[in-house]
Amino acid sequence: MDQFRPSRFEVLPLVVKNLLIINGLVFLGSLAYENFYHSDLSDLLALRYITSPDFKPYQLITHMFMHANFMHLFSNMFSLWMFGSVLENVWGPKRFLIFYMICGLGGALCHMVATGFELHQMDVAFKFFLSHPDQEQFMVLLKKYPPPYELSTALNGVTNIHEAIHFTMQLYRVYENTGAVGASGAVF
C-alpha cells in the first residue's frame, strides 16, 4: 500500500483549502441568490428525503456544501481546518478527499435512514388519526409532532375535524420535505 509522506506539515493543505473555498463560495452564492431571487438556495440544494417530490439525486453531494447561517459555516470550516489539515497531512490529499466524500455520503445515508424511521412512525400515527378522527387524537398528534413555525399560524384556523385532517396531511408533507444542510457528518 502506498503511503503518503509529506515533506513538511502544511497548515493549510490543498484539499482542505479548496473545500474551505468551495464552502465559502457556496455560502456567498446562496446569500446572493436569496437577495436576487428572493428564494432560498437550500430549497434546491439541501438534502430531501427520497420520497419527497423535491428530492433530486444531486442533493446527495450538494447538501455537504450548504450551511444554514454564518455560525454554522464558521464552526464547520473551523473543524474542517483543525482536523482535516492533520488528516490530509498524514493520509495525503487523495485519501483525505475520498474520506471526506464518503463521510458526507454516509451522513446522507444516516439522515435518510433516520428520516425514514421517523416518517414511518409519523405515518402510523397519522393513519391512526385518520381512521379515528376526533379532537383528542388531533391534540395527541400535535403534541407528538409539533408543527414547525410556517404551519403554526395555519393551526389557529383549524376549527373542525375536516380542517384537522387537512392540517395533518400538510404537516406530514412539511416533515417529509424538510432538508438537511451542512455536511451531515462529513466533518464530525
Name each model-derived stretch.
Residues 1-188:
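A detector for small-residue-rich transmembrane helices and their helix-helix packing motifs
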